[in-house]
């Protein structure tokens, strides 16, 4: 049986960007700049920006982050897939949050709206 290939972090952020543009209503009331520091082979710095220009997800840094999340890429993929609860990841030390904790809590509902 062939093993499924998981998307790398760049591909996941491309999917998030497409989903945000397809249905920007999921970001209403969640305006902010979220920065992700992902560790691992396919890690890097990514941002999810929700502002007057419209929601988007990018590789790199475009704006000053208001909320920074640090984790391994496998933890990130599990969060996006919905197989890991963000609160459990935070309490278990798998997810570190700096900055606006309120934004981090709002992010969970955005991530939960995706189905990939």
Predicted regions and their residues:
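Feature captures hydrophobic
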Residues: 1-116
